[in-house]
Swiss-Prot record:
The keyword Transmembrane helix applies. Pfam families: DUF1266. It is a multi-pass membrane protein. The gene is ynjI. This is Inner membrane protein YnjI. It comes from Escherichia coli (strain K12). Residues 1-38, 90-234 are periplasmic. Residues 60-68, 256-346 are cytoplasmic.
């Protein structure tokens, strides 16, 4: 039987299409676009409360007059209609998501590609994004290509896409596919940070250990092990988890913004994934190295020297994704098996 792709409603942690939650999340989205919608939201809640009060009065009172009974009846009908709209929102969200996949030709991913996206699943889960497709948020169909009327499924706004493109350009120098490829090769060469960690651990390991443990608790033997080249591996672990996570996240974002094509994004994502599953024994092993790597990079490689308070904030920021994911996530991506460590990176 063919697998049907179905993910969370964007903006929700739940995989079930909870009509009330979707109804509320759409209200929040509309309020961001138009502050006046806040009055509509609270007006809706207020009318529901008043309707409940009228219905309660009708049930508990022994002698409502005719006008009171009519008011209570209308209030009850109003509540039924509102409940119907809320339930409908859940069904409509599911229908729209399925239609979106069909219209765009999006199919369930192979296990290998799911294993690749699992590497950044904690970040996507924290931000309530999609986890089983390359695009992490629905992208508005091009004019004329999909005439279906979407009412519940939230799309990336032009403003958000513009800000992400600006961020990729400012932080990573990505303007087109050529500059994207140059950055990916820079990561794979180790020159972004992995080689610096290796050199520093060879020259002054005690200093590196002291710097890292100023903001977090990484056992000294663990940090030393990351610098040692194990037999049968293409390299030492170094801070490769952080580097590879950046590669996958940047590739996904560049595709989401329309900067690069899907095929190119998957090419580098799968290169990163194969290296990750060759070097690390489990998801926990990968995420631990990732946290250490992000912290090290911000201490020793970032173009601007950060204060201790900023470094501590960076570490807490990166750590929260895995903590939240490991405690709360019930998404299918959580159950994807770790890739075979025997698969060599090439």
């Amino acid at each position: 039987m063919k697998k049907v792709l179905l993910q969370n409603h964007p903006g929700s942690e739940k995989y079930s299409f909870n009509g009330w939650e979707i109804f509320n999340s759409n209200f929040e989205r509309m309020i961001k676009e138009n502050k006046a919608m806040l009055l509509c939201k609270w007006g809706f809640y207020l009318t529901c409360v008043v309707a409940v009060m009228f219905v309660f009065a009708a049930i508990t009172s022994n002698g409502l007059n005719e006008r009171g009974l009519i008011t209570a009846g209308c209030s009850f009908l109003y509540l039924l209609i509102m409940m119907g709209l809320i339930v409908r929102a859940g069904f409509k969200a599911k229908k729209e998501q399925l239609h979106y996949y069909q219209a765009k030709g999006i199919e369930p991913l192979s296990i290998e590609k799911l294993q690749a996206l699992q590497l950044i699943a904690p970040y996507r889960f924290y931000h309530k994004q999609w986890s089983e497709t390359l695009e992490f948020w629905p992208r508005k169909p091009e004019p004329g290509k999909d005439t279906f009327q979407y009412h519940v499924l939230p799309f990336d706004s032009i403003d958000i896409i513009s800000k992400r493109r600006e961020s990729l350009e400012d932080q990573w120098g990505i303007e087109d596919s050529e500059s994207y490829c140059a950055l990916m090769e820079h990561f794979l060469s180790g020159d972004h940070g992995a080689n610096t960690f290796k050199a520093n651990m060879e020259e002054a390991p005690e200093q590196v250990i002291a710097l890292l443990n100023k903001f977090a608790v990484f056992p000294s033997d663990y940090i030393s092990d990351c610098a040692n080249h194990s037999s049968g591996k293409s390299s030492a672990k170094l801070i490769w988890a952080a580097e590879l996570s950046w590669m996958i996240s940047i590739s996904s974002t560049a595709f989401q913004n329309g900067t690069i094509e899907e095929e190119l994004a998957w090419h580098y994502i799968m290169l990163a994934s194969r290296k990750a599953h060759e070097l690390f024994e489990s998801e926990e092993d990968y995420q631990k190295n990732s946290q250490m790597g992000f912290l090290y990079w911000h201490i020793c490689c970032y173009r601007r020297k950060l204060t201790d308070a900023e470094l501590e904030a960076c570490y807490r920021y990166d750590k929260q994704f895995w903590e939240h994911y490991s405690k709360k996530c019930r998404w299918p991506i959580r159950n994807v098996p770790w890739g075979a460590s025997s698969v060599k990176y090439s």
